[in-house]
A protein has these predicted regions:
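Pyridoxal 5′-phosphate
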Residues: 1-183
Length: 183
């Protein structure tokens, strides 16, 4: 009997072309991209900058706005905790997130709440979709950030990000999207 892998919401196989490219930089072009003073570092730097341009093109950003981290947890912490620091300076200390966020988002949010930030947890409907009406009702002038995942890592449910963004259109809150499962 052939095994069936049924956890593709959490982890999928790496595209062969991507694996080959990563392997090339791990085995052959293994220089330090922060040390472009020699050939290995220069080639590694060129690889990182190409990856930065490729990611920027996919997400309609400028390459200089793409920051690489070790993974989704570090990225979420950087975004949420960094925003919180800025929020303290401007008096905006309210975060909103959905009830079904990954722990990589929930843990920093809970930490912020324990340190005095206000947090609103949005409910989802019976299909696991965030209720945009509840988001609109939860917004306040001191709302700093709304964090909604793109695709749920357990159910595969896609969130209505266009509607979420539209609800924030006239508000000054940041929209943080954990897109690790949907990129």
């Amino acid at each position: 009997m052939m095994p069936a892998y049924l956890d593709c919401n959490a982890t999928t196989p790496v595209e062969k072309e991507v694996a080959r490219e990563v392997s090339r930089f791990l085995v052959e072009e293994y220089g330090n991209p922060a040390s472009p003073v020699h050939m290995y570092g220069t080639i590694a730097r060129m690889g990182v900058e190409k990856a930065r341009r490729d990611v920027a093109a996919v997400v309609a950003a400028q390459p200089e706005d793409v920051i690489f981290t070790s993974g989704a947890t570090e990225s979420n912490n950087l975004a949420l905790l960094g925003l919180a620091e800025a929020g303290l300076r401007c008096g905006r200390t309210h975060f909103i997130c959905s009830a079904i966020e990954h722990k990589a988002v929930l843990e920093p949010i809970e930490s912020l709440q324990a340190s005095g930030f206000e947090v609103t947890i949005l409910p989802v409907d019976r299909t696991g979709v965030v209720r945009v009406e509840a988001l609109a009702e939860a917004l306040r002038p001191e709302t700093l950030c709304v964090s909604i995942m793109h695709v749920n890592n357990e159910t595969g449910v896609l969130q209505p990000l266009d509607e979420v963004a539209k609800a924030l259109q006239d508000h000054h809150a940041w929209l943080h999207i954990d897109a690790a499962q949907g990129f």
